[in-house]
């Protein structure tokens, strides 16, 4: 059995015989106690791996793999009502360049566009749909996301974000002015999350799971 040092892909760990500490019992607790969860933990705590676990568990396209991936784990013995019932939209905002307003905007917009394209390809949307999203790229991440939600209509969405605060904390450490520009009123980051809030209120986003960093003295 192999040690999964630095490995955060749940499916790979399970199917390639890596050592795995079963934390899937927490999935049922999360499902019972709210639809909108935030996991605040230090670096190297396993946040990204747990997020990957949730994606495999809830993704409707993974339903035929459920027994192979989860059958021997706690959640496999007691699955929840919502298993494999969602389309998953996943964002990862770690490692965005924060040297300037344009750096952050390009990085954030690029990550947003990549995630939306991957979703549309995975769930069988047309090339025309992808082009409609790309047409909004020049208008910023909020415009892309707004078009995306309009496009997918009544799809049952589970939205996950890994390290949503990573770049914002880096910016805050360097420049309060830049932080205010991107996160404050009128900022493109704030606009992005306002679109998510609206989609949640409209029932397009049914559940959310977000990871963020708990900063310690050695972080």
Q: What function would you assign to each model-found segment?
A:
Residues 70-117:
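P-loop NTPase motor core
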Residues 57-67:
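Post-Walker A helix-loop "phosphate-sensing" segment adjacent to the P-loop in P-loop NTPases
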Residues 215-219:
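Conserved small/polar residues in nucleotide/adenosyl-binding loops
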Residues 119-163, 186:
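Mid-core helix/loop region of P-loop NTP-binding domains shared across ATPases and GTPases
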Residues 5-25:
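N-terminal pre-Walker A segment at the start of P-loop NTPase domains
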Residues 148, 181-204:
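Substrate-engagement module of ASCE P-loop NTPases
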Residues 160, 207-212:
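Structural recognition of the conserved hydrophobic beta-strand(s) that form the central parallel beta-sheet
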Residues 47:
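Conserved lysine of the Walker
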């Amino acid at each position: 059995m192999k040690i999964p040092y630095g490995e955060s892909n749940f499916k790979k760990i399970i199917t390639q015989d890596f050592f795995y500490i079963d934390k899937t019992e927490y999935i049922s607790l999360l499902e019972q106690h709210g639809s909108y969860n935030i996991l605040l933990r230090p670096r190297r705590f396993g946040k990204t791996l747990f997020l990957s676990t949730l994606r495999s568990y809830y993704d409707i396209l993974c339903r035929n793999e459920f027994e192979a991936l989860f059958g021997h784990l706690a959640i496999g013995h007691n699955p929840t009502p919502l298993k494999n019932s969602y389309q998953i939209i996943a964002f990862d905002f770690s490692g965005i360049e924060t040297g300037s307003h344009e750096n952050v905007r390009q990085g954030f917009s690029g990550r947003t566009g990549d995630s939306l394209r991957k979703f549309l390809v995975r769930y069988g949307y047309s090339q025309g749909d992808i082009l409609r999203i790309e047409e909004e790229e020049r208008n910023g991440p909020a415009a892309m996301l707004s078009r995306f939600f309009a496009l997918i209509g009544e799809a049952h969405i589970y939205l996950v974000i890994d390290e949503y605060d990573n770049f914002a904390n880096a910016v805050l450490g360097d420049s309060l002015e830049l932080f205010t520009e991107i996160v404050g009123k009128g900022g493109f980051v704030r606009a992005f999350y306002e679109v998510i809030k609206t989609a949640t209120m409209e029932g397009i986003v049914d559940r959310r799971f977000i990871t963020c960093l708990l900063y310690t003295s050695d972080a």
